[in-house]
């Protein structure tokens, strides 16, 4: 499961042609500022000691906000022993009750390993320049053994469409601008919200 999506990129030179964050210039500036300060870095699951945190966008009080999240879940003060950087869309769709809090993860590329060749492939939205897109995620609060509190997140993986299935059988669930509000509000039943997100992706 860890190989499903264990790294992605966020290029500070990215454009936002789909207007994912067009209505919030301050958020977009914060995001690009973070990307510039971390230019050239591959975004990886958060390490227990390094504590690398990555940008996520959530909704609070009807407004979108940029937070730094811990990629993977914290359980009993430590990174979970079960794989938690990714969550299968089917698992969420079958969930009883409401979804965990929803978020999106800004990115300009993601990386998948093709098996058995162990060859890495990079996927992105722009042909000539990096373009922003949004990975669907769910979040939950977490706390380390020393008492520090974090927002933890898990990237949602869906069955890969046919055009990508030759590389990997799973792919991140992408949230387009037109569906961003519905996704971040997270009000629909899980099965409906996940089905709609996949249809819009």
Where in the sequence are the language-model features?
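Short linear sequence motif anchored by a di-proline
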Residues: 1-201
């Amino acid at each position: 499961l860890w190989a499903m999506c264990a790294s992605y990129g966020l290029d500070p030179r990215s454009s936002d042609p789909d207007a994912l964050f067009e209505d919030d210039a301050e958020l977009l500036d914060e995001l690009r500022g973070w990307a510039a300060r971390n230019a050239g870095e591959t975004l990886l699951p958060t390490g227990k000691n390094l504590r690398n945190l990555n940008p996520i966008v959530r909704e609070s009080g009807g407004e979108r906000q940029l937070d730094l999240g811990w990629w993977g879940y914290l359980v009993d003060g430590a990174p979970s022993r079960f794989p938690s950087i990714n969550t299968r869309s089917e698992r969420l769709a079958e969930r009883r009750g409401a979804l965990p809090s929803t978020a999106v993860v800004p990115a300009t590329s993601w990386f998948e390993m093709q098996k058995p060749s162990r060859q890495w492939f990079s996927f992105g939205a722009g042909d000539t320049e990096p373009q922003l897109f949004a990975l669907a995620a769910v979040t939950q609060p977490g706390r380390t053994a020393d008492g520090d509190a974090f927002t933890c997140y898990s990237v949602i993986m869906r069955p890969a469409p046919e055009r990508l299935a030759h590389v990997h059988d799973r792919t991140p669930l992408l949230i387009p601008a037109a569906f961003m509000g519905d996704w971040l509000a997270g009000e629909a039943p899980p099965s409906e919200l996940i089905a709609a997100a996949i249809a819009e992706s």
